[in-house]
């Protein structure tokens, strides 16, 4: 099986070997001829060659793009044929836009059985040539000689076509070197006229050729002149013709122009042959004229000069002169013409001519200067006669003559002097011109006036020359505008003064020629003194006259010399110093000088003429020098002056060349002067260059922006050569350095709101150039009122329209040159009234008047009225809401009638210390250390009791049983207000008591039985009685939150049927608890079914260690204090806003297993052992204590002591070690079950309560002043306005029945309810800012009165002393109630009576937002009394009893220091029974704790005198002896650590009051032992179902021996 395959393999191998031997000559194919790339035209045949060899002969196949090519072998109809040689032949190339089957890359493959061979790639491309040229050549137009370029881009094609050009249908000869074809561009470098023609671009490739569009080359010819104009010289009034002929292609246009100006209007014409003809040529027609030939290719110019030959005319004519014998005289003669005429002199009758270029002869006394002046020296009598001056040029000649008179004796008098000449003026048409000319001289000068060089004709009636020389022109016309010259002449010479006068049509006020105030013009300077003299220079000095006139700003120097003429010449001006060197004087000449001072207002009178001064003589020239030769050679010197170079605004550089030098050139004189019509023919200024080789110089100190004419002249000593030609140069401009003058602003008559602004240009020397424009700013008091105007430099007025009336505008004007605007003028103010008339400065109203005008505007009055109306409406709305809120509270009081346990006190807000103190609705302590915070009942409460004598009850007596008339009468049964005025005598400080009574009397006489607060079974004849029928002190009810009212109302209906049965067994004692009313009400509901009590419920408030105040940390809804009984007219400052917070949300959940509560039946106290009935009202300290061991005899001097209010508003400051004897009736909803437990006998045996921390609350405000030592009553019942005022007498029986029914109910002690302090957070806020239960007071007179009672209410007051409890007990005694006293036994076995104390709880309805909720508190059902005396049994409805609350964690608050030291003052503190009694009482209660709610009223037991560091020492501290009673002996207390931290929360225990021997620190947790108190209860059957509001439970009070002790309290 294995060998059989091997046979097969062997056989195959043999066959293979035998086959290879048979075909050894075969070889695989190879390509011999590869195909090549082809470019073929569409539709043309093509062949792709491919040749291969091999054995056997290989077969050839073609592939295109990787796919086999189909040939005729595959398809006979195919246009592709495979030739035998292997080549691929295309019959025609198929090529379309969408289908290109033949184009591509081909390969040929040769195969045989040995293999295959592949050729190279060969591409077959289809040649194309499109028809459209990518760029056709465009027409070109060039001038002869310019290059011409034609661009062409052939159409797209493959292969790329080549370009050639045709001209006029023939191929272009590119052999011409001027023609270049590159990249399709045809370029002809230098065109000729023969190159013009039509050109075509031709594109060619294998497909064919394409021709572009025809482009034409146009060759134009620039203009050229056939005949040019030539220079002409003609005389004046002749005609001048300039010929001009030009050619070009196209034919050029020909025009003429004058290089330096315009062609003379109406005197020239251009003929058809382009010839320019000027008729009546004038001298102004001289210049260069240019013929301009221009066509579309270019232009050509040809110029010619016209010279106008002007006959000479005299500029200065000689005048007759009188000269003394032997003197020198000069005749001036100056002429101009074109060319410059020659001047020569001759004496009439003589043929001898004297020329200016003639050298002077030493023997001759006659000479002619270069300027043409004839000078005769050493005049002789034979020189008398006429002398003729003649001028001559090619245009003509003129002559003039002057007479010389020679006298024997003649003074060398100067010419006259013009003291005051005319000034430039601008007047309105029909105005009057006054031109003054005051001249002095000897003899008196003759004054002549010329206008523009022509004598003014006086034949015109408008023109008159006065004798003084003044020229007066009335009714000025526009034609009177011109330059006026005053000439003053005498035989010795003349003086001239010119001014320019302009007459305008409108708006130019008449200006006086000189300022009317002479102090504005400088006075004449002093006589000039000569300090230095040279050949050509004289130096002068002078002093200004500062005694009168204004201070000069510059000076003008004038000089006179007979050698220079017969008139005064201005030698220098604008001289800034008092010393000046005058240059350019003639040698060997006598000169006189005078000086004038000048400022902006004018020129002063001339100074005195200086002494004559003679310049030095010319130094003699070298010997042998011929003067004639010097003059001749200087005359042949020719200077060529170049165009000056402008260097700056005040300097110019001048260059010149000398054509022919001379040895007699000593230097050059550069003469320059301002040119232009405005400057006139001013004198030439000379700048000498004494270096002959120098050919340039810089002329300094030129005026800015002025056009100067400059020329040069060679000189040699006194000899001078010919002048060069004149050149012009203009210095650079600068902004004017002075403002325009005489700026005026006036009302424009044409427009009601337009003004006219006029001005004069700045002084010429300050213009610093040509004024091109004036800028006018009209600025209002706001940007939107600004108006700017710009006018040209020749305009001196502008109208500014559209001014806003009432706006004060300031107008400023500034001149502007090419360098910019210059200095602004002084602002001119104008204001238009509502009628468009200018308001004078006197008429401009003051600011107060403007305000008054605004106030009188109807719109303003309407706006004020609308604002007042809005304010009134807002106030009305606020008042309505305020009253509505009060009415809402009043309507809520109606519910108080239904619930006897509700008490509410409206408030009056006072302002004390700059802050709001609200007494309404803010429960808290009454701090005697804070003055002026006592709340008052607003007198707006109606007093319905008309007979106060019947029912008024005076709380306190003055110690003798008489009522104090200074106190307000109260009429609330069983309530007492202590009169402390008689107790303090000299201890009342800072009292802010009102002058009159502010209490409202509430009349309860008509319907006392309807007063639900008193409608209890124990109410009899208007007095409260206990079950045994004895009158009992009234215990007020307590406020609760508004959110409890609904629950109370709902549970009132069935309250009588639901009885709570306390457990009979006694339960172990637990730690005292403390909580606030919110926690109590909230938590008791949850634990109503549970019979256990949490150990501690902290108060939700924090304590201030400085003030003893407490901070309220709850946020309860209440109404504002401002809505509760404000007194009319009382100012209620706004209380500071405090952020509200709902602190109830922060309370933790109750514990799962609260501790059990005490058995209330353990509470046993005799009601019979009560206070004595006669007790004077004590002075309440703050905090007030009830001291034990007071003498019984003190009770006889006191009035009834009201029950102690709840003083313990801060848990950290109070420890309750005595149980209160006040039995207060809580409502079912606020069953204070945890509070009805006994405190330990002594807190010293009680371990420290756990450290509690309080939540920080808002910081307290600054401390308040000390309160006065008066405590005012608080009404604890419904308002009189809410009661029926007509209670009948017949309802007394019903009251008796109710009293009988209530005897079966047990009296429950009111639980201690901590009052949340206000959000202000200090003690004052918890005292005056709280609404607390008030106390009424009963006087002895009311014991026998009817049931009527007048109820007075005071808001926010609070008793903080134990005397308040004594007052209540005394009131109960007065009312016929038997007050029980508890007999105690101390440690030594001694028995004594201990007065029961129970501080009145504070109100729970104060909130952080200073709101007081009106809460209807339901009466707690009276408890059934057991048979054993002294014990109380609780009887309540199961559904209404709340479970004990869970104690939340204590919240710690930061201690806030008081900002002011409170006043130290003595206070009256009642003494309590001895400590032994308390010890004994504590020992009696060790067996169990009381479960009753008798101890719910707490009191703060603090004494500011106590040292907080050692409570035991504080206990042993003796009385200071200031009390009225006898001090009790000191007793030792069991040692106990009773101090708690100031921030600790103390457990609740029934409060008592420390003795004077045992004061307590406010921060200490009191170590006093607690003492229970009970009420004597009698069993009463037939307890029916009653309204909860009618169930009042009265508390019994024990008698106690108490004394008042005066304590000093210090608060820091």
From Swiss-Prot:
Gene disruption phenotype: Mice show defects in commissural axon guidance in spinal cord including midline recrossing and an altered lateral and ventral funiculi projection. The phenotype resembles that of a SLIT1;SLIT2;SLIT3 triple mutant. They also mimick a naturally occurring human homozygous deletion mutant detected in a small lung cancer cell line, frequently die at birth by respiratory failure with accompanying abnormal lung histology. Surviving mice develop bronchial hyperplasia.
Record GO cellular component, one term: axolemma
Annotated ranges, domain Fibronectin type-III: 524-618, 637-734, 739-835
Subcellular location: Cell membrane; Cell projection, Axon; Endoplasmic reticulum-Golgi intermediate compartment membrane
Biased composition (Acidic residues): 1283-1297, 1603-1612
Cytoplasmic side: 880-1612
PTM: Ubiquitinated. May be deubiquitinated by USP33.
Modified residues (Phosphoserine): 901, 1016, 1258
Residues where Phosphotyrosine is found: 999, 1034, 1075
Modified residues (Phosphothreonine): 909, 1201
Keyword hit for Lipid metabolism: no
Membrane topology: Single-pass type I membrane protein; Single-pass membrane protein
Transmembrane segments: 859-879
Broad class of where this protein is predominantly found: membrane
Keywords: Cell membrane, Cell projection, Chemotaxis, Developmental protein, Differentiation, Disulfide bond, Glycoprotein, Immunoglobulin domain, Membrane, Neurogenesis, Phosphoprotein, Receptor, Repeat, Signal, Transmembrane, Transmembrane helix, Ubl conjugation
UniProt superkingdom: Eukaryota
Residues the record marks as carrying a glycan: 121, 424, 751, 781, 788
Region described as Disordered: 1045-1068, 1088-1298, 1313-1358, 1381-1612
Domain Ig-like C2-type: 29-125, 131-218, 223-307, 312-407, 416-502
Disulphide bridges, residue numbers: 50-108, 152-201, 244-291, 333-389, 437-486
PROSITE patterns reported in the protein's UniProt record: FN3 (PS50853), IG_LIKE (PS50835)
Effect of residue 270 to T: Loss of expression in the kidney of homozygous mice. Mutant mice have severe urogenital defects, congenital heart defects and craniofacial abnormalities
Entry function: Receptor for SLIT1 and SLIT2 that mediates cellular responses to molecular guidance cues in cellular migration, including axonal navigation at the ventral midline of the neural tube and projection of axons to different regions during neuronal development. Interaction with the intracellular domain of FLRT3 mediates axon attraction towards cells expressing NTN1. In axon growth cones, the silencing of the attractive effect of NTN1 by SLIT2 may require the formation of a ROBO1-DCC complex.
Family statement drawn from the similarity comment of this UniProt entry: Belongs to the immunoglobulin superfamily. ROBO family.
Name by which UniProt lists this protein: Roundabout homolog 1
Lineage: Eukaryota, Metazoa, Chordata, Craniata, Vertebrata
Name of the gene encoding the protein in the UniProt record: Robo1
């Amino acid at each position: 099986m294995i060998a059989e395959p091997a046979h097969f393999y062997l056989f195959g191998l043999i066959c293979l070997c035998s086959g290879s031997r048979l075909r050894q000559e075969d070889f695989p194919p190879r390509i011999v001829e590869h195909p090549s790339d082809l470019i073929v035209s569409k539709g043309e045949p093509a062949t792709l060659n491919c040749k291969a060899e091999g054995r056997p002969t290989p077969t050839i196949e073609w592939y295109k793009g990787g796919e086999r090519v189909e040939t005729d072998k595959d398809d006979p109809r195919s246009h592709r044929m495979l030739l035998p040689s292997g080549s691929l032949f295309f019959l025609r190339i198929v090529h379309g836009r969408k289908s290109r089957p033949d184009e591509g890359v081909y390969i040929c493959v040769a195969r045989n059985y040995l293999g295959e061979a592949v050729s190279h790639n060969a591409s077959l491309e289809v040649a194309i040539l499109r028809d459209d040229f990518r760029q056709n050549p465009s027409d070109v137009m060039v001038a002869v000689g310019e290059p011409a370029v034609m661009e062409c881009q052939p159409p797209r094609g493959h292969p790329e076509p080549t370009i050639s050009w045709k001209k006029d249908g023939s191929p272009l000869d590119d052999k011409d070197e001027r023609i270049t074809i590159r990249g399709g561009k045809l370029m002809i470098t230098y065109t000729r006229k023969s190159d013009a023609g039509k050109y075509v671009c031709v594109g060619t490739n294998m497909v064919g050729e394409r021709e572009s569009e025809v482009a034409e080359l146009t060759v134009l010819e620039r203009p050229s002149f056939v005949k040019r104009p030539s220079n002409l010289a003609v005389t004046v009034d002749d005609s001048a013709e300039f010929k001009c002929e030009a050619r070009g292609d196209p034919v050029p246009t020909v025009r003429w122009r004058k290089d330096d100006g315009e062609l003379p209007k109406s005197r020239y014409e251009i003929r058809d042959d382009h010839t320019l003809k000027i008729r009546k040529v004038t001298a102004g027609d001289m210049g260069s004229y240019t013929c301009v030939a221009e066509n579309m290719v270019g232009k050509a110019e040809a110029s010619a000069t016209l010279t106008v030959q002007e006959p000479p005319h005299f500029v200065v004519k000689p005048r007759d002169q009188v000269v003394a014998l032997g003197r020198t005289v000069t005749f001036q003669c100056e002429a101009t013409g074109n060319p410059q005429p020659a001047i020569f002199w001759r004496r009439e009758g003589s043929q001898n001519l004297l020329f200016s270029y003639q050298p002077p002869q030493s023997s001759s006394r006659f000479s002619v200067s270069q300027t043409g002046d004839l000078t005769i020296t050493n005049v002789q009598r034979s020189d008398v006669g006429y002398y003729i001056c003649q001028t001559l040029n090619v245009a003509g000649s003129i002559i003039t003559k002057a007479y010389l008179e020679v006298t024997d004796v003649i003074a060398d008098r100067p010419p006259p002097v013009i003291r005051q000449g005319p000034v430039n003026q601008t007047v309105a048409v029909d105005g009057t011109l006054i031109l003054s000319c005051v001249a002095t001289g000897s003899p008196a000068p003759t004054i002549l006036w010329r206008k523009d060089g022509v004598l003014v004709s006086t034949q015109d009636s408008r023109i008159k020359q006065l004798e003084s020389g003044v020229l007066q022109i009335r009714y000025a016309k526009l034609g009177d505008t011109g330059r006026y010259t005053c000439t003053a002449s005498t035989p010795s010479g003349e003086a001239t003064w010119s001014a320019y006068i302009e007459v305008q049509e409108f708006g130019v006020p008449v200006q006086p020629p000189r300022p009317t105030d002479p102090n504005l013009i400088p006075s004449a300077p002093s006589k000039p003194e000569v300090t230095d003299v040279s050949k050509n220079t004289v130096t002068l000095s002078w002093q200004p006259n500062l005694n009168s006139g204004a201070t000069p700003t510059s000076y003008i120097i004038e000089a006179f010399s007979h050698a220079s003429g017969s008139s005064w010449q201005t030698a220098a001006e604008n001289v800034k110093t008092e010393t000046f060197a005058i240059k350019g004087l003639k040698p060997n000449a006598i000169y006189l000088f005078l000086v004038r001072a000048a400022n902006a207002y004018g020129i002063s009178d001339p100074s005195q003429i200086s002494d004559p001064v003679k310049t030095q003589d010319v130094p003699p020239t070298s010997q042998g020098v011929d003067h004639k030769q010097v003059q001749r050679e200087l005359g042949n010197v020719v200077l060529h002056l170049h165009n000056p170079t402008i260097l700056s605004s005040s300097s110019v550089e001048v260059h010149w060349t000398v054509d022919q030098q001379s040895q007699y050139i000593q230097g050059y004189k550069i003469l320059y002067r301002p040119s232009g019509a405005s400057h006139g023919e001013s004198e030439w200024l000379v700048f000498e260059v004494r270096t002959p080789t120098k050919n340039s110089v810089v002329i300094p100190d030129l005026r800015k922006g002025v056009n100067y004419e400059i020329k040069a002249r060679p000189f040699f000593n006194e000899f001078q050569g010919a002048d060069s030609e004149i050149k012009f140069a203009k210095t650079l401009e600068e902004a004017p350095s002075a403002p325009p003058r005489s700026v005026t602003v006036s009302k424009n008559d044409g427009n009601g709101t337009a003004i006219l602004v006029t001005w004069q240009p700045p002084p010429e020397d300050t213009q610093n150039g040509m004024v091109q424009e004036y800028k006018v700013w009209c600025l209002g008091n706001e940007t939107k009122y600004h108006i700017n105007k710009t006018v040209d430099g020749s305009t001196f007025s502008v109208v500014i329209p559209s001014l806003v009336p009432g706006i004060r505008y300031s107008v400023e004007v500034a001149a502007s040159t090419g360098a910019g605007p210059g200095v602004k003028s002084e602002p001119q103010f104008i204001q238009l009234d509502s009628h468009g008339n200018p308001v004078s400065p006197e008429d401009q109203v003051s600011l107060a008047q403007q305000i008054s005008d605004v106030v009188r505007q109807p719109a303003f009055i309407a706006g004020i009225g609308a604002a007042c109306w809005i304010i009134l409406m807002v106030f009305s709305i606020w008042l309505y809401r305020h009253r509505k809120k009060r009415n809402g509270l009043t309507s809520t009081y109606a519910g108080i009638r239904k619930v006897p346990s509700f008490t509410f006190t409206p408030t009056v807000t006072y302002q004390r210390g700059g802050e709001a103190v609200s007494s309404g609705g803010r429960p808290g302590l009454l701090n005697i250390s804070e003055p002026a915070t006592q709340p008052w009942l607003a007198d707006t409460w109606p007093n319905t009791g008309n007979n106060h004598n019947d029912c008024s009850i005076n709380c306190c007596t003055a110690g003798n049983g008489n009522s104090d008339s200074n106190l307000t009468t109260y009429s609330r049964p069983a309530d007492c207000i202590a009169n402390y005025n008689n107790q303090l005598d000299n201890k009342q400080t800072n009292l802010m008591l009102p002058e009159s009574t502010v209490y409202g009397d509430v009349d309860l006489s008509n319907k006392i039985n309807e007063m639900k607060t008193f409608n209890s079974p124990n109410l009899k004849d208007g007095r409260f009685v206990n079950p045994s029928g004895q009158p009992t002190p009234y215990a007020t009810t307590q406020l609760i939150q508004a959110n409890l009212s609904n629950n109370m109302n709902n549970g009132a209906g069935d309250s009588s049927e639901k009885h709570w049965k306390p457990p009979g067994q006694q339960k172990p004692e637990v730690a005292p608890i403390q909580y606030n009313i919110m926690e109590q009400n909230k938590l008791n509901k949850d634990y109503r079914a549970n019979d256990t009590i949490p150990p501690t419920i902290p108060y939700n408030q924090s304590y201030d260690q400085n003030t003893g105040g407490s901070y309220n940390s709850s946020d309860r809804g209440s109404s504002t204090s401002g809505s509760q009984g404000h007194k009319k007219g009382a100012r209620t400052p706004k209380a500071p806003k405090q952020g509200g917070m709902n602190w109830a949300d922060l309370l933790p959940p109750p514990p799962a297993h609260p501790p059990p509560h005490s058995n209330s039946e353990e509470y046993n106290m005799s009601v019979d052992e009560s206070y004595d009935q006669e007790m004077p009202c004590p002075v309440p300290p703050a905090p007030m204590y009830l001291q034990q061991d007071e003498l019984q005899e003190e009770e006889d001097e006191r009035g009834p002591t009201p029950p102690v209010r709840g003083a313990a508003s801060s848990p950290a400051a109070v420890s309750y070690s005595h149980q209160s004897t006040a039995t207060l009736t809580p409502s079912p909803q606020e069953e204070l079950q945890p509070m009805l437990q006994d405190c330990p006998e002594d807190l010293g045996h009680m371990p420290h309560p756990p450290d509690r921390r309080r939540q920080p609350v808002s910081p307290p405000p600054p401390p308040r002043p000390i309160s006065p030592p008066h405590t005012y009553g608080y009404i604890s019942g419904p308002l009189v306005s809410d009661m029926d005022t007509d209670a009948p007498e017949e309802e007394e029986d019903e009251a008796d029945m109710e009293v009988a029914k209530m005897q079966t109910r047990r009296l429950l002690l009111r639980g201690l309810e901590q009052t949340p302090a206000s959000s202000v957070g200090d003690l004052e806020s918890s005292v005056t800012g709280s609404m607390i239960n008030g106390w009424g007071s009963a006087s002895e007179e009311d014991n026998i009165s009817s049931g009527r009672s007048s109820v007075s209410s005071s808001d926010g007051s609070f008793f903080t002393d134990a005397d308040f409890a004594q007052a209540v007990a005394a009131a109960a005694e007065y009312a016929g109630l038997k007050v029980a006293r508890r007999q105690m036994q101390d440690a030594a076995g001694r028995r004594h009576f201990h007065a029961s104390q129970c501080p009145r709880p504070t109100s729970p309805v104060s909130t952080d937002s200073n709101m007081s909720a009106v809460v209807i508190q339901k009466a707690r059902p009276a408890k059934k009394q057991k048979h054993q005396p002294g014990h109380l049994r609780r009887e309540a409805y199961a559904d209404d009893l709340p479970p004990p609350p869970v104690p939340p964690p204590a919240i710690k608050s930061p201690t806030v220091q008081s900002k002011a030291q409170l006043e130290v003052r003595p206070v009256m503190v009642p003494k309590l029974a001895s400590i032994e009694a308390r010890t004994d009482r504590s020992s009696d209660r060790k067996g169990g704790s009381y479960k009753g709610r008798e101890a719910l009223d707490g009191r703060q037991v603090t004494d500011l005198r106590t040292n907080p560091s050692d409570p035991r020492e504080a206990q042993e501290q003796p009385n200071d002896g200031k009390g009225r009673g006898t001090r009790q002996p000191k007793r030792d207390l069991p040692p106990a650590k009773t101090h708690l931290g100031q921030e600790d929360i103390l457990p609740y225990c029934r409060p008592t009051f420390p003795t004077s021997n045992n004061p307590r620190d406010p921060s200490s947790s009191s170590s006093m032992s607690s003492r229970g108190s009970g009420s004597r209860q009698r069993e009463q059957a037939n307890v029916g179902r009653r309204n909860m509001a009618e169930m009042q439970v009265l508390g019994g009070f024990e008698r106690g021996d108490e004394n008042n002790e005066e304590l000093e309290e210090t608060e820091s």
